């Protein structure tokens, strides 16, 4: 008993020192990387307020989305390096939902890991992660659920789309616009690192949520992308939702317009600490839906040249599509909606109750409408072949270059590159794939009195 009490006190004191030390070090540190037309301060999500996207803190930092008052969906690689049963017992964890999450997390630490709804911070009492994520770490099957020990009744929840997006127009179709690519406008958000497009995620984490826009670049697999870009797959057939980060000036030497579309005014990309955050199909810019929908959870980012830095122009981000894991999410969602059957019965009799459809589950019906529902067929999960999908993948440097080429993912046919102007200063045979997860935070310096960690 004495040993467990001492360990608990040590954990608490260490956690408080770490949190307050980081707060002292986090001046001008920033999440989500904007293009060079915006600053990291300008994309702080002040207008979003407490919107159901929160920061996850355990041994590192990730982002997650509240899907009911007791459940958050996020990325498995944020937690799958330990047994799921460790969380909520020997490893404290929490989600905080304020735009500036630091006051809530400090309060959670200082009060023995206690939820505080007034500060929108909630202790985690259980975590479940997809075992399929263990095979590749963060590349496939990267989905997890966390339950909160106190209902987050004062925090909005999000609807989840469990159907694949309809295949959009592609090259050769009347009305296809390569500047818009798939035509699906998405929002990205998270609490991770920030920076600027030309330099990548040069700023650390400051516990604030940031947001940016992008176009959905493709639904395809890392195998299919790799086959086109450098002539070989890597045993990763599962489809992913992908976005790229376009240079609005089309002058960056590493920007190959990897998923065909042009830069948006407030375009951005993801960085370390944004893992688990939502890919949002927003109602304002998409005729498909009258409400914002979560399409996927962030797993990581890619760069394509050794001299290129992560989270900079020309890179991309990849998300786990929720429609591939609808059965896993529904089976492991700890929050149930129930109602009584007709007729008299005892309150304690389980046969007098029925499970109801979760009001935040969405599908696209046969008429093309987004409705409350659940898929009739089981999804493929990590077994998805990657042969189906959509979007256009490109090796398209700025300028009219002999080696530029694109491929229509849905047909497998060549597609015309869309860029012109500018100068190509590197060659396509330098392309190589580098992937990184986007969890974690900044490593701590050695503890001193001055930095508050001693």
Segments from the language model and where they lie:
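Solvent-exposed adhesion/ligand-recognition segments of exported proteins
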Residues: 335-454
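A conserved glycine-rich beta-strand in the N-terminal activation segment of trypsin-fold
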Residues: 52-69, 137-138
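N-terminal secretory signal peptides that target proteins for export/translocation
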Residues: 1-8
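C-terminal subregion of chymotrypsin/trypsin-like serine protease catalytic domains
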Residues: 30-45, 63-102, 204-213, 218-223, ...
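Chymotrypsin/trypsin-fold serine protease catalytic domain
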Residues: 140-143, 149-267
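C-terminal segment of classical bacterial N-terminal signal peptides
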Residues: 19-28
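Sec-dependent N-terminal signal peptides
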Residues: 8-18
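Conserved H-D interstitial segment of serine endopeptidase catalytic domains
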Residues: 32-35, 81-137, 154, 330
């Amino acid at each position: 008993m004495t040993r467990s009490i001492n360990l608990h006190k040590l954990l608490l004191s260490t956690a408080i020192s770490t949190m307050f030390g980081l707060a002292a070090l986090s001046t001008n540190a920033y999440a989500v990387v904007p293009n060079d037309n915006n600053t990291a301060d300008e994309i702080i999500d002040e207008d979003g307020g407490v919107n159901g996207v929160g920061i996850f803190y355990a041994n590192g930092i990730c982002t997650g989305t509240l899907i009911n008052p007791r459940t958050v969906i996020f990325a498995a690689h944020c937690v799958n390096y330990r047994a799921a049963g460790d969380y909520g017992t020997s490893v404290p964890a929490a989600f905080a939902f304020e735009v500036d999450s630091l006051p809530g997390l400090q309060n959670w630490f200082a009060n023995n890991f206690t939820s505080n709804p007034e500060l929108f911070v909630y202790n985690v009492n259980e975590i479940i992660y997809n075992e399929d994520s263990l095979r590749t770490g963060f590349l496939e099957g990267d989905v997890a659920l966390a339950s909160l020990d106190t209902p987050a009744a004062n925090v909005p929840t999000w609807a989840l789309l469990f159907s694949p997006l309809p295949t959009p127009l592609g090259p050769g179709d009347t009305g296809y616009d390569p500047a818009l690519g798939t035509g699906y406008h998405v929002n990205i958000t998270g609490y991770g690192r920030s920076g600027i497009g030309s330099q990548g995620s040069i700023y650390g984490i400051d516990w604030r949520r940031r947001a940016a826009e992008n176009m959905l670049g493709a639904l395809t697999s890392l195998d299919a992308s790799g086959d086109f870009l450098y002539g070989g797959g890597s045993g990763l057939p599962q489809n992913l939702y992908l976005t790229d980060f376009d240079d609005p000036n089309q002058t960056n030497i590493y920007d190959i317009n990897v998923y065909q579309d042009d830069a948006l005014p407030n375009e951005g990309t993801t960085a370390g600490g944004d893992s688990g955050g939502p890919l949002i199909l927003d109602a304002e810019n998409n005729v498909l839906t009258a409400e914002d929908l979560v399409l996927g959870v962030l797993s990581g980012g890619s760069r394509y040249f050794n001299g290129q830095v992560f989270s900079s122009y020309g890179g991309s981000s990849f998300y786990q599509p929720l429609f591939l894991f609808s059965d896993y999410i529904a089976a492991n969602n700890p929050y149930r909606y129930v109602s009584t059957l007709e007729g008299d019965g005892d309150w304690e009799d389980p046969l007098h109750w029925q499970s109801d459809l979760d009001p935040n589950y969405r599908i696209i019906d046969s008429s093309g409408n987004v409705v409350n529902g659940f898929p009739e067929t089981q999804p493929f999960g990590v077994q998805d072949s990657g042969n189906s999908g959509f979007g256009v993948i490109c090796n398209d440097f700025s300028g009219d270059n002999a080696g530029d080429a694109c491929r229509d993912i849905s047909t497998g046919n060549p597609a015309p590159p869309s860029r012109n102007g500018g100068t190509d200063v590197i060659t396509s045979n330098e392309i190589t794939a580098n992937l990184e997860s986007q969890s974690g935070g900044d490593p701590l310096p050695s503890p001193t009195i001055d930095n508050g960690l001693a």
